[in-house]
Design a protein with these regions (language model features):
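N-terminal periplasmic accessory domains that precede
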Residues: 91-96, 170-178, 218-221, 255-256, ...
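Surface-exposed extracellular loop regions of Gram-negative outer-membrane beta-barrel proteins
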Residues: 290-305, 344, 348, 360, ...
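Outer membrane beta-barrel strand-and-loop segments of large Gram-negative receptors
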Residues: 490-494, 540-542, 635, 641, ...
Length: 850
């Protein structure tokens, strides 16, 4: 049973007058666990706690002479990734690298003598980038924990020729170094670690070993993922839409969690553009953020403030605290955001239903949004195999339209002026959000782990709107009041098993359940629009399994996800739609290496279900000719996505083909009895296809790290417009050139250019727009204090301009969000704050659909 000993604790009775105990011992090629066990038995002043299996692979050869127990242990540790912590008479020894695999061996010379203090580096077999490394001990032995199953072992030592060879993880035996003749000269060697890599189809940014470490917040880090777009506060993966973001396995419902995470605490960021069966069926792309793990007891945190100037000033303040004591973590976070924003619309719309109605409108609004976000929770490690925790997330948000400098509309019927109005809009929203999550993470056996999550969610949105329309012709005013109230509730449970069947095979399987209800009403006091009461209910049962295997140069996985949905949509107390969805969604991944060229083939099938906003029947009033409404008959769309990825050195290529069945897109319908008046809503088309390609180049030139991303997508889509078939097939593209220069004395400079190239995005033909951004940053007080100055959209070139043609309406819309701005921020870190919550949440997809 010694192989499975969790910790060795020998209780000692310390009597008065006992002097300090010293140790003299000789250890020759014994395991670290055996040496600690021996030290513990030979004295009674200290109690040594450790995990036997964790340290057994580390061999030690050491002569201990008259040393204290702590000094003897530190002497044994040497260069191994092991740390010792002493609390009074308790000594805790643990491996600081918790990887599941280990590369182990012994370095000798041609005379079979051990080579000590040799550098052993593990390199990625695909691109030779550094994975991790270690140093040999006095007996020439090394043990290096790592996450990979195969790596290039590179051994270097002064006086010997460098050795390189590929091995599978485990015991590699003895490696012999040949002698080398060296002419010593004054030489400076400077290396650069590759910070963008691709493995098994997943694009990874090594944040800790790049200049992104000090960029600011996690929100800033994500912007520098190749192929990532950031427009008006939203992230979008090129050709894939909005991604789902995870932090340490915990799904994020908004960007507040990202803004509370400092980039210094981000270890890596991973982009998955073709998720497998383990992810929810509606997920088309995933961003996984892994944070740096700290184990220091005490208080840690971050405080920060930011001020920005667009047309108006906005400000943001935050404080995050984390208290870590032994097995308990308690964390609290609060953020206040006061955002002033401005937006201008210019709309030119033609309605060809029967007569020709031509609408010309222009409006500009200034509004304010104030929000309070808070997060409190705890994690408790019962022991090394079992952890429990919980958290509460809350948000209070209030929105109000402050001013409308101008808002007018002119309508022509068959080229004759029909109406001309000056409009005044007053609008406000109150939003409340509450989420309670409980979780359990347990290691049931050495090869089987279980994750459990339970969620309860409640959200409420109240919206009020008053639109005053004054005729320029007869000065008659007309007022329209709209009031909407929507509430959402969800409960969810999720369980996931991870079974390491053997060294090369793994099976992940799990299930989740959720029950959602959404209800509300819309009221028009003047009776122009019929009042409405709606209620939506949805129950979901889901299960998945993913089998992963590796053999020689090949790695692969096959997954299957099943979801059953029972949905009921009620309007005005009458059941309008009662549907059962039963979907079986397969996924497949295959990767290999041909020399230094890596290849990956992925296939996934997903389903995107309508949001409750798209389904509810309430009407939003824009003006007398323009409404917006949900569609209770809207069906889910099914996405089938195939990717081929090839990477070599600094180059990364991707080909992508997407087929979407029952494609969801905007459309327009006429309002009965009101000529010229239309309602915009979502509907389904038969299908949609697009073919895409993307190339990323990421070299390093000294202190300059440029990244070039070029991509293009060609859509294939046809709809009926004005009695004829219209193709929406113009390709759209992306060009991004990002540059970072790391200067001396902790100065950092960035200069980035983004260009979205004109083309069709569904029914929208979007004109090209661009953004040129600059940033300078300085760190002080040993990098605890960070001061940043940014200038975004310097040339004011990010204005949107699109044309949509559908059914009998053509609309040209120009939008100016006044993105040009200056941002100044300051943040102070103490003890490197990190949110340590380990739960993943089980209701996140339901929250997003609200």
């Amino acid at each position: 049973m010694s192989k499975y000993l969790i910790s060795l604790i020998l209780l000692s009775v310390i009597s008065m007058g006992v002097s300090a105990q010293r140790i003299t011992r000789q250890y020759n090629n014994v395991s670290f666990s055996a040496a600690l066990k021996d030290l513990n038995a030979r004295q009674d002043k200290y109690v040594i706690n450790f995990v036997y299996d964790e340290l057994e692979d580390f061999k030690v050869t050491k002569n201990i002479k008259n040393e204290s127990v702590p000094d003897a242990i530190m002497n044994l540790i040497g260069f191994y990734p092991i740390k010792m912590k002493q609390v009074d008479n308790i000594i805790i020894v643990e491996c600081i690298q918790k990887a599941s695999n280990r590369m182990m061996g012994r370095i000798v010379d041609t005379r079979h003598q051990p080579v000590d203090f040799a550098n052993v580096a593990l390199l990625n077999v695909s691109d030779s980038s550094l994975v991790t490394g270690g140093v040999t001990n006095e007996n020439g032995q090394f043990v290096i924990p790592c996450e990979v199953k195969k790596a290039i072992v590179k051994v270097s030592c002064v006086g010997y020729k460098t050795y390189c060879n590929a091995y599978r993880t485990g015991e590699v035996g003895a490696i012999t170094l040949e002698d080398a003749t060296i002419n010593l000269q004054k030489v400076m060697i400077k290396g650069h670690r590759k910070y963008i890599s691709r493995e098994n189809g997943k694009l990874t940014l090594d944040v800790q070993n790049s200049n992104l470490k000090n960029i600011g917040k996690a929100t800033d880090v994500i912007k520098y993922i190749p192929g990532m777009l950031y427009t008006n506060g939203k992230y979008e993966v090129f050709g894939k839409g909005e991604p789902v973001i995870y932090i340490d396995g915990r799904k994020q419902t908004n960007t507040s969690g990202l803004s509370l995470l400092s980039s210094t605490n981000v270890k890596s960021v991973q982009l998955i553009t073709n998720p497998g069966a383990e992810y929810d069926a509606e997920t088309r792309s995933v961003i996984n953020i892994t944070t740096v793990h700290h184990s220091l007891d005490g208080l840690s945190g971050i405080v920060g403030a930011e001020i920005s100037k667009h047309k108006n000033l906005s400000n943001n303040e935050e404080v995050n605290l984390n208290i870590h004591k032994g097995a308990l973590d308690v964390f609290l976070a609060y953020q206040y955001d006061n955002t002033r924003s401005d937006i201008r619309y210019d709309v030119n719309q033609f309605n060809y239903e029967q007569d020709t109605f031509h609408e010309i409108s222009a409006s500009e609004y200034s509004d304010r949004s104030r929000s309070h976000d808070y997060n409190v929770g705890m994690n408790y490690a019962i022991n090394k195999n079992h952890t429990i925790g919980g958290r509460y997330l809350g948000s209070i948000s209030n929105y109000k339209m402050l001013d409308s400098p101008f808002d007018y509309m002119q309508t022509y019927k068959n080229d004759e002026l029909l109406t001309a109005t000056d409009n005044k809009t007053e609008e406000s929203e109150k939003e409340r959000f509450h989420n309670v999550n409980l979780y359990y993470i347990g290691k049931l056996t050495d090869n089987l782990q279980l994750n459990l999550d339970a969620d309860y969610v409640y959200a409420q949105l109240k919206h009020k709107q008053q639109v005053s329309e004054t005729s320029r012709i007869d000065a008659v005013s007309e007022i329209t009041h709209m009031r909407n109230d929507q509430r959402n509730r969800a409960t969810a449970l999720k369980g996931v098993f991870a079974w390491n069947m053997n060294k090369n095979d793994r099976l992940d399987f799990g299930t989740d359940f959720s029950k959602i209800s959404s209800w509300g009403m819309s009221v028009n006091e003047e009776g122009k629009i019929a009042d409405d009461q709606f209620k939506n209910k949805e129950t979901k049962y889901a299960g998945f399994a993913t089998f992963s295997l590796s053999a020689s140069k090949w790695k692969g996985s096959i997954g299957l996800r099943y979801e059953y949905i029972h949905a009921i949509n009620t309007d005005q107390g009458e059941v309008k739609n009662k549907t059962n969805y039963s979907d079986l969604l397969p996924s497949l991944s295959l990767s290999t290496m041909f020399g230094r060229v890596g290849m990956n083939l992925d296939f996934s099938s997903r389903v995107n279900r309508p949001s409750f906003r798209q389904l509810n029947n309430s009407v939003s009033y824009n003006n007398q000719y323009h409404y917006e409404q949900g569609n209770i008959y809207l069906k889910p769309q099914y996405v089938y996505d195939t990717e081929l990825i090839v990477n070599y050195s600094i180059f990364d290529f991707k080909l992508d083909y997407q087929y979407i069945k029952d494609y969801i897109h905007p459309t327009v319908v006429a309002v009965s009895g009101k000529p010229g008046t239309v309602t915009w809503m979502s509907t389904n088309a038969k299908d949609f296809q697009q073919l895409g390609a993307q190339c990323v180049v990421s070299p390093v030139f000294g202190c300059w790290r440029p990244t070039l991303t070029v991509g293009v997508y060609k859509p294939y889509f046809t709809l009926s417009y004005n009695g004829e078939q219209l193709d929406y097939n113009h390709p759209y593209g992306l060009f991004a050139f990002q540059n970072v220069v790391a200067l001396r004395n902790d100065w950092l400079f960035r200069c980035d250019f983004f260009w979205n190239i004109k083309g069709h995005h569904g029914i929208y033909e979007q004109n090209g727009y661009s953004s040129f951004n600059m940033m300078v940053q300085k760190q002080l007080l040993k990098k605890k204090l960070t001061i940043t100055l940014k200038a975004e959209d310097l040339f004011d070139s990010s204005k949107l301009n699109d044309v949509k043609r559908v059914n009998f309406v053509a609309q040209n819309r120009k939008v100016n969000n006044f993105n040009r701005c200056i941002i100044a921020s300051i943040s102070y870190n103490f003890n490197s704050f990190k949110d340590k919550y380990n739960g993943s949440g089980s209701a996140e997809d339901e929250i997003n659909r609200f």
